[in-house]
């Protein structure tokens, strides 16, 4: 697609500070690949809701109605649709019954890294619209407890709808401030997902000016302050030895590696490796930082995937401590 829309034209459409940041962080060849990804029209992707259906039945059904698809090598319950868009899929009976969930492949990664098990208590701290919440519940085979928190009231209603349509009865939806959850539920959860609000650089597309129009360096700086508050809350809500997955759909270092370094400096946590082999994934950068930061992965935007960043923390054994370095 970048052969039709040239690299120079793509760069000229995007915020200059964003472009400059990319060249500071990546090699020119990788930056060009990111621009090509931003210029791609992404294929429709989905996962089967294993609480109601199974991948073999779904593939059989798609073959019967002549929907062409491709398997996802790193996740058996996901498909890439080759000849139908989201509106086409939404018309299908299996969509309306909640048998499938339209979801980007990148956003399937954090729940898989979290690896929730039957009977566990799980927190999704910033949960709307519910793709990851419902995925977590399905991975648990509908056995256990998931608290899904969302601050925005309208988004919270969308979250409730998706939870209900997917048949995820183990999910409790609450409309609260994420930074307060740690105080309300101290050391309550076995695992916590913090898929934090971010600047969304991994979702930029030249076909939607709104995807990048409001981006600014100030927005990134403001978001990092909120991300730190949310991380503190996530940490405090997590049991000792528990797993905390921190993820964003953005590309910059400030909201990703620098948050990881700050967390390692201020909390009793360590980073764990991510054992998912994704072709579009790169190790996070750790130059001048804790060497373990390269255990996190950055997914570059492409035809199949949005840009994403995923990391996995393990909490140490001692009790929660008050962290004041939130600047």
Residue locations for each model-derived region?
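S-adenosylmethionine
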Residues: 1-327
């Amino acid at each position: 697609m970048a052969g039709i829309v040239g690299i120079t034209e793509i760069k000229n459409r995007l915020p200059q500070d964003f472009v400059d940041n990319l060249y500071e962080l990546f090699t020119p060849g990788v930056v060009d690949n990111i621009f090509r990804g931003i210029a791609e029209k992404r294929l429709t992707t989905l996962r089967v809701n294993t609480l109601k259906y199974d991948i073999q039945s779904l593939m059989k059904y798609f073959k019967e109605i002549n929907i062409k698809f491709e398997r996802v090598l790193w996740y058996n319950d996901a498909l890439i649709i080759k000849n139908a868009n989201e509106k086409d899929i939404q018309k299908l009976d299996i969509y309306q019954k909640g048998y499938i969930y339209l979801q980007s492949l990148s956003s399937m990664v954090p729940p898989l890294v979290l690896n929730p098990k039957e009977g566990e208590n799980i927190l999704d701290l910033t949960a709307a619209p519910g793709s990851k919440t419902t995925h977590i519940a399905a991975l648990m085979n509908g056995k256990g407890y998931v608290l899904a928190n969302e601050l925005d009231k309208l988004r919270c209603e969308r979250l409730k709808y998706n939870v209900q349509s997917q048949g995820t009865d183990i999910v409790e939806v609450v409309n609260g401030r994420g930074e307060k959850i740690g105080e309300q539920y101290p050391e309550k959860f076995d695992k916590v997902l913090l898929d934090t609000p971010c600047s969304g650089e991994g979702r930029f597309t030249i076909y939607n000016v709104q995807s990048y129009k409001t981006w600014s360096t100030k927005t990134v700086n403001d978001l990092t302050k909120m991300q730190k508050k949310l991380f503190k809350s996530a940490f405090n809500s997590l049991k000792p030895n528990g797993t905390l997955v921190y993820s964003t759909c953005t590309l910059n270092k400030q909201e990703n590696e620098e948050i990881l370094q700050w967390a390692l400096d201020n909390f009793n946590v360590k980073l764990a490796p991510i054992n998912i082999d994704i072709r579009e994934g790169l190790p996070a950068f750790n130059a001048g930082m804790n060497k373990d930061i390269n255990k996190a992965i950055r997914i570059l935007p492409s035809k199949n995937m949005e840009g994403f960043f995923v990391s996995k923390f393990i909490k140490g054994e001692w009790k929660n401590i008050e962290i004041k370095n939130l600047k």
